[in-house]
Structure formats: structure tokens, C-alpha cells
Design a protein with these regions (language model features):
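Membrane helix-loop boundary segments at the extracytoplasmic
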Residues: 83-94, 409-416, 448-489
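Alpha-helical transmembrane segments of multi-pass inner-membrane proteins
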Residues: 2-5, 9, 21-29, 34-45, ...
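Long extracytoplasmic/lumenal interhelical loops at the membrane interface
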Residues: 214-216, 221, 345-360, 368, ...
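Membrane-interface helix caps and helix-loop-helix hairpins in membrane proteins
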Residues: 50, 93-96, 148-158, 273-274, ...
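Transmembrane signal-anchor hairpin modules in multi-pass inner-membrane enzymes, especially those
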Residues: 1-144, 155, 179-189, 245-259, ...
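Hydrophobic alpha-helical transmembrane segments
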Residues: 418-430
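Membrane-interface micro-motifs in multi-pass membrane enzymes
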Residues: 52-56, 96-105, 158-162, 223-237, ...
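Loop-to-helix entry and N-terminal half of a specific, functionally important transmembrane alpha helix
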Residues: 260-266, 403-407, 435-467
Length: 514
């Protein structure tokens, strides 16, 4: 006890000495001194790093500024992420690849969100009870369960963690932010602006190579790995930007804003066409089909029944469809008509044949472990053993080290079993249904159409997800979950037609009484 008392006295004595010293100076003097000391340390550190060629440490001030910005502007950080993501570049540090600067910021926001939710309680609890949120949580819970049955638990838990730092900052954080609809405008504007910068750079690269078709696959590097992810991102943004063009005047946009929106849309369409992404082209056609059906005032139940009937028809006609596809020998090319025709070539087109190879591996993995799957994130490491010689393409590797399933639906099927497929698909279906419901029920015409066009943007990825898999990357996760948050926020916070009608009736009664 005497030792503790002595320590307390020593601490108090030290405090009094420091206080008496600093009391001699004004607050401004102390501030200037601290700022000057920090500047001196940064300069000294910079000189040291330059002398010894530790150039990476020159980013420390930028990192510190980013951390300070995220902490001070926590609620608006998602808009900052939207601005940075298209311009982010993948960098490898030893065996770890990370997208700089977007992913470090996402991780920081993820940690700060957990702190704010669990230690301060500053978050609206009703968000967690919204149908889309419930579907997301169920999917994450099943992912957690399958982590314990995984072939490699460490890999699976890393995969789950990476999904959390996409979903929480890009879905749960912006839902509350989007109560202010101007923040939705800012999100779409920031992401589209950065994406258009990438498109301009990619188009310039493409032009410098004489618009050679083979270079179309790589002209967007280092910002996007290949043309498919690039095309998918553009397809996601075209419907929301088109909304601002169609309803800009009603939103009160002046000439300057309208010119800005038109410029964005023209650049997006140019990049979309020059991406030569067949899956993206098909997905945008599907989104337009949704718009036609919804504007035709067809009931939601009818749409769902039609979808189910189409699935049944395709299932029973699968043999004939595949037979027709096998007769197509048109390979992908720079000619638009030929490139579109090559979509159904499953006999000689290397990309399509390799996609079928990956799908066959995923189905075989599911058959082996139908309940829990091989574990989240494990497909990449295991699919090589399931390859059949007759399924291989000219771009296949014997070791099977080229990556993903090329499907947002077969990935959870192979990694998390049948329940994984159902919970993952449920997120898409529930969001689509809620988006159409929000369009039908929202009192504000502008917000109703915003919900519809956001749903159309998401539809492009639901369709694209049959052929590719990109939600494990920040490039697609940020706009995808951001638009999902737009749909949820409008459904959650916008005034419904029924409530608006009640308010109007009350006003009429009050006026009649007067």
C-alpha cells in the first residue's frame, strides 16, 4: 500500500510541475508550440526518409489527415469513400493485396461504426429491423456458421471480416445519412465523377493503341483489373445518373447542373460501349426491361410469377438451349454485332468455356458438401482439384489458380451450401421487391422514381452476377451497397402515400370546420 501511495504522490507532483510550467503561457502560445513541434518532427522525419529512401513513410501525413477527417466527419465519410473508390489502386505488401486508399478508410470506418453502435448507442435501431437489413444479417450469420465448418477457418474468417468492412460502412452507415436526400445526390455525383475520370483515362489509353480490341480488356488498368468489373461498375451507375437527367428540372437543377449531368451520362455511355463487356450490355437491357414492366403498372406479384415461370421454362428447355449455343462458333471481336453474337458461344469462345469450367467445379463442390459447403472464401484455393479435362479451356491452368466462380450465385452454393445460396439470393430478391414497393408507396414522385432507378441500377448487377463475381472488391461493393442503402432509406424514411392521404384528409376536415 505504501508503494501505491508513493506512486500517487509522485504522479500528483509531476502533474503540478507540468501545470505550473504551462500556466506561465497563454493557450495560443501552447498551441503554436505544439504545431511547430509537430512540423519540426515531420520535416526531420521527411529528411531522414529521403536520405535512406524510405519513400513510403512520406505518406504518414496524408494518412494522419485521412484519419482525422474520418473521425471529424464520420457520418459523411461514405461520400469521401465514394469519391475515392474508382480512383483507388491495388497495391501488394508482401502477401497482402489492398486497394489504396479506399480499403484502409473502409476498415477505419468499420471500427468506428462498431465503437459508435456498441459503446455510445448512437444509431437508429429500427434500421436493423428493416427487411433488407434482416436479409443481410441472416446471410452474415450463415456465413459465420459456415466459417466453423470450413476447410480452412482462418481464410473463411478473413473473408467474413472483409465482407463486414464493405457492408457496414457502405450499407448501414449511409442508410441514416440518406435521410437527407441531398446526400444521395452527392453519393451518385461523387462516384460518377471519379468513374468518369477513370473512363477518360481508359479511353485515352485505348485510343493510343488504335482502339485495338485486345487492349480493350486492359485499358482501364490500374484502376480496374479488367473490362468486366469496369463495365459492371458503369452499368450500375447509368440508371441513377439517367434519373437526374430525366427529373433534373423538377429537382430544381440549373443549367450548370444539367450540363454536368449530361456530360457524366455521355462519358458513362461511352465507357460502357468501349468496355466491350457483354455481361454489362445484357444487364443494362434487363434493367430497361424492369423499367418498362414497372411503368406498365403490372402488379409485383405478376412480375414474380412471370419470373418463376421463365425459370421453369428455361429449366425444362435447358438441353435445347445448350444445343443451340453449342452450334454458335462466333468468337468475341471488335465488331459490335459479332461481339454480341459471341455471348452464346460456349464451344470456341475461351472466356465462355472457362466460365462453364468454373461453374462445373462449383457444382461438383456443392455435390460433395451440400449443406455447409467448403467454407467462405475457399473456392479459389480448392476448385483446381475439381476440374475435368473435357471442361478445360485454352486459358485454364492445371493448378486452378485463376480465381473466382464467375457467379454471385454459384459462389455461395459451393462455399456455403444450399442455405448459403438461398440467403445470398434473398438479399437480392428482398431489395428488388422493396425497391418496387417503395416506388409504388412513396408519396413523393421524385423519391419514388429515385427508388425505381436505384433498383434498376442494382438489377444490372443481379443479372451480371450470373456471369461474374465482384462484390468481394471495393470497386463494386461500394456502389452496390450504396444503392441498396438508397432503396432501404427511401422505404424507411420517405412519407408513404397512405400517410400523405391521411394528412390531406385531416387538413380538409380542419378547413371544413373553419
Amino acid at each position: 500500500m505504501k508503494a501505491f501511495d508513493l506512486a500517487d504522490k509522485l504522479i500528483e507532483k509531476t502533474k503540478s510541475v507540468f501545470n505550473s510550467f504551462f500556466d506561465r503561457f497563454s493557450d495560443n502560445t501552447i498551441t503554436y508550440f505544439c504545431v511547430g513541434l509537430c512540423c519540426a518532427l515531420f520535416i526531420a522525419g521527411g529528411v531522414y526518409c529521403l536520405n535512406y529512401e524510405y519513400y513510403i513513410y512520406a505518406l504518414i501525413p496524408v494518412v494522419l489527415f485521412g484519419i482525422l477527417f474520418v473521425i471529424k466527419q464520420f457520418k459523411n465519410t461514405f461520400l469521401f469513400i465514394a469519391l475515392l473508390t474508382p480512383l483507388a489502386v491495388n497495391m501488394s505488401f508482401k502477401e497482402v493485396a489492398i486497394s489504396i486508399p479506399s480499403e484502409p478508410i473502409l476498415i477505419l470506418v468499420f471500427l468506428l461504426f462498431l465503437w459508435e453502435r456498441f459503446f455510445t448507442g448512437r444509431y437508429e435501431g429500427k434500421v436493423f429491423s428493416h427487411p433488407i437489413s434482416v436479409a443481410v444479417i441472416i446471410n452474415l450469420v450463415w456465413t459465420l456458421i459456415t466459417c466453423f465448418t470450413s476447410e480452412d477457418m482462418l481464410v473463411s474468417f478473413k473473408y467474413l471480416l472483409s465482407q463486414l468492412w464493405f457492408i457496414i460502412p457502405c450499407f448501414y452507415l449511409p442508410i441514416v445519412l440518406f435521410k437527407n436526400t441531398r446526400k444521395i445526390d452527392a453519393f451518385v455525383g461523387f462516384y460518377s465523377l471519379s468513374l468518369c475520370i477513370v473512363i477518360c483515362i481508359a479511353t485515352a489509353n485505348f485510343a493510343s493503341h488504335g482502339f485495338a480490341f485486345n487492349f480493350a480488356h486492359y485499358s482501364m488498368q490500374p484502376f480496374y483489373n479488367d473490362h468486366t468489373a469496369y463495365g459492371a461498375a458503369i452499368a450500375l451507375l447509368i440508371p441513377p445518373v439517367a434519373y437526374y437527367l430525366i427529373y433534373g428540372k423538377e429537382l430544381g437543377f440549373g443549367k450548370g447542373k444539367m450540363i454536368f449531368v449530361i456530360t457524366l451520362l455521355v462519358i458513362l455511355i461511352t465507357g460502357f460501349v468501349l468496355s466491350y463487356s457483354r455481361a454489362a450490355w445484357v444487364s443494362l437491357c434487363a434493367a430497361f426491361g424492369v423499367w418498362v414492366l414497372v411503368k406498365s403498372n403490372i402488379k409485383l406479384k405478376t412480375l414474380i410469377y412471370c419470373g418463376l415461370v421463365m425459370c421453369v421454362v428455361v429449366a425444362f428447355s435447358w438441353g435445347r438451349i445448350m444445343g443451340a449455343f453449342e452450334k454458335n462458333d462466333q468468337d468475341s471481336s471488335g465488331n459490335m454485332a459479332e461481339h454480341i453474337s459471341s455471348i452464346t458461344n460456349i464451344s470456341t469462345d475461351a472466356s465462355n468455356v472457362e466460365r462453364l469450367n468454373r461453374w462445373a467445379c462449383a457444382l461438383d463442390m456443392f455435390k460433395e458438401r451440400p449443406v455447409f459447403g467448403c467454407g467462405p472464401g475457399m473456392y479459389t484455393f480448392l476448385y483446381g482439384a475439381y476440374q475435368k479435362s473435357y471442361n478445360l479451356s485454352i486459358i485454364s491452368t492445371d493448378s486452378g489458380d485463376l480465381g473466382s466462380t464467375h457467379s454471385e450465385y454459384l459462389r455461395p452454393l459451393s462455399e456455403q451450401g444450399l442455405i448459403g445460396l438461398l440467403t445470398n439470393t434473398a438479399v437480392f430478391v428482398v431489395t428488388f421487391v422493396i425497391g418496387i414497393r417503395a416506388y409504388r408507396r412513396t408519396a413523393s414522385k421524385l423519391l419514388a422514381n429515385l427508388a425505381l432507378f436505384a433498383t434498376m441500377g442494382l438489377t444490372t448487377y443481379y443479372v451480371h452476377g450470373f456471369l461474374n463475381q465482384f462484390l468481394e472488391t471495393d470497386k463494386l461493393a461500394v456502389p452496390f451497397w450504396g444503392l441498396t442503402a438508397v432503396v432501404a432509406a427511401i422505404d424507411l424514411y420517405a412519407t408513404k402515400k397512405e400517410k400523405q392521404a391521411e394528412k390531406d384528409n385531416e387538413k380538409q376536415l380542419l378547413n371544413s370546420e373553419k
